[in-house]
Amino acid sequence: MSEPLRVDVVFDFVCPWCYIGKRRLEAALEDWQSAHPGGPKPAVRWLPFQLNPDIPSGGMSRREHVELKNRPAGPDLEKQKQVGSLARGLGLAFELDKITVQPNTLDAHRLSGCAEKLGRQDEMVEALLKAFFMQGISLNDHEALSDLATTVGFDWSQVAAYLMSTTDVQVVARLEQEVRTAGVDMVPFFIFNGKVTVSGAHEVKVLLEAMEMATTAETAAVVG
């Protein structure tokens, strides 16, 4: 195998299933590399998708957002428990009660794209997901985002200036439009070698099946 496996992950920072999917992908990639010793390391790219693009740039009340989203039935508490249980099984201690602000995720996706240019995208994505789901940090707080960026090697003042600008706003919009035009309407959504897709946070074995298929398939295929 001369070419590395390419993995594109369409995701949003406020989607708990995306964090679960990230952990399952990591486990699948570890198994993949064990099964292909000496092969090139898979290349993972995170692509933006905003589940709630109409939320104001400063975010909105989490409680209000949940109430609006779940009318008239109200929040599905059983589903929330299921997500929390699955997350704990993967070592993710979600603290959803700490989330008071439902953010607009444009700035977080901008930071993700900026980090990609420096080869640190996965670390940035992990830092932002952890901050939101485990600490309740607002992803619209530029000071908090700048602090988080320093944990993966960025300069605080440069990140703060970047977030205050409009740099990469149109890049995020273009990338999101491209995946929506391609038919992506939910996240997480995995694309292996540009042709084999998996929609949803499936088990590791499903992701591995897609990886194997992606190295041999000549046409597009859907797995899971």
Predicted regions located by residue number:
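C-terminal cap of thioredoxin/glutaredoxin-like
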Residues: E3-V14, I20-S34, G38, P42, ...
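Structural alpha/beta surface segment adjacent to cysteine/selenocysteine redox centers
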Residues: R23-F132, A221-V222
